[in-house]
Design a protein with these regions (language model features):
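Bacterial N-terminal signal peptides
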Residues: 9-18
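Non-globular targeting/processing and membrane-anchoring segments
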Residues: 25-149, 231-362
Length: 362
């Protein structure tokens, strides 16, 4: 118990710099920190305003303005248009397994969700009080963030090894800095940030509460869009293979928010493996709508009597890094595919990408 309390206090301290004011007079907020990291001006009177005169931040802001502007034009605006036409009745919850910190595409595909549940192996990490970084520390931190995000800004997915190197042991580490950036660049306002832990029954615990053994750690971010409606983003660091998924409380927690809609992309074809059958079965049982590329759940696992399939794009098979994952029934299904004007997944070029919209007709 004493050992856990020390861990819990340390976990809570990680978020102090961003979830609540650092100095009562300064009013440093998570939202201002997110905007600063995203290359966007913080609110008037923020202690971070002084740092925006730093040439490294100004270069960073120009870089992100250009990168996100291109991404918006090339993909995100087109995904939102596709969603508006093809998703008739979205659920309040969306599940995004193997996501990394990719809130950007979760929001683009499911802008009307009110609860977003993201999960991956990477830890949440921390965001320190940026005003207290040593001289030159801000520029180095911003550069590492840019490097860690280069693949998703260019290709729509994270390269996990690169992200670990760039956001491993530095001032900014884990997924939280990137979640902040994506929230800010998606036009969201962060209202609250807290560490969260799940016990093995799926119950959520905060602050110094003891979740017991087999805990699953994460972060809960409460935010609002331009309409002011409050929403919640959960990110959990968890192993989704059977040996872990069956003893942790993560899927039990997800079940309390089900049914939901699900997104699967660039998932290393893990859901093709028998070692990930637990999460695969959860998604099939608790998803009203599934959007996936071919790295998601193989067609053979869908009950053809319960699901209706709407293929988009072109199925060109897996990339060379994933041999043996070709699906002949995908080839047959995609003979009737509708066109789409954006790229997604490992085959990120628009004329090579595939997307399968599956609707549970139960």
């Amino acid at each position: 118990m004493r050992h856990f309390n020390k861990i819990a206090v340390a976990a809570a301290a990680i978020f102090v710099a961003t979830a609540s004011p650092v100095h009562a007079a300064d009013k440093l907020t998570a939202d201002d920190t997110a905007r600063f990291l995203a290359g966007m001006p913080p609110s008037a009177g923020s202690p971070l305003t002084a740092l925006t005169s730093d040439p490294s931040w100004q270069r960073h802001a120009r870089f992100f303005d250009a990168a996100f502007g291109q991404l918006e034009q090339r993909q995100l605006s087109r995904i939102r248009a596709w969603t508006g036409v093809n998703l008739a009745a979205p659920k309040p919850t969306m599940f995004y397994m193997f996501s990394g910190p990719d809130f950007l595409y979760a929001d683009a595909f499911f802008p009307n969700a009110t609860s977003y549940v993201l999960s991956a192996l990477e830890p949440p990490g921390s965001v320190p009080d940026l005003t207290r970084l040593p001289r030159g520390g801000v520029g180095a931190a911003l550069y590492n963030v840019e490097r860690s995000m280069s693949s998703i800004l260019s290709f729509s997915f994270f390269i996990t090894k690169s992200m670990k190197l760039d956001l491993g042991d530095g001032q900014l580490n884990g997924t939280l800095p990137i979640l902040y950036i994506f929230l800010a660049r998606s036009g969201k306002t962060i209202r609250d940030v807290n560490p969260i832990a799940l016990d093995d029954k799926g119950a959520a615990h905060f602050a110094n509460e003891n979740p017991g053994r087999n805990l699953t750690r994460g972060v809960r971010i409460v935010f609002a869009g331009s309409d002011g409606r409050e929403k919640t983003l959960y990110y959990f660091s968890t192993d989704l293979s059977n040996s872990s998924a069956r003893v942790s409380g993560f899927l039990k927690f997800c079940e309390t928010l089900a049914p939901g809609d699900s997104l699967i992309k660039s998932a290393s074809y893990l859901l093709h493996s028998p070692n990930f059958s637990a999460v695969r079965e959860f998604l099939l049982a608790h998803s009203a709508t599934m959007i996936q590329d071919d790295s998601g759940i193989p067609l053979a696992f869908y009950d053809q009597r319960r699901w209706r399939f709407f293929p988009f794009g072109r199925y060109a098979g897996p990339i060379a890094e994933f041999p043996g994952r070709y699906q002949p029934n995908y080839t047959e299904l995609f003979k009737r595919a509708q066109p789409m004007d954006f790229g997604i997944g490992y085959r990120w070029r628009a004329h090579e990408s595939n997307l399968l919209l599956s609707i549970n007709a139960r």
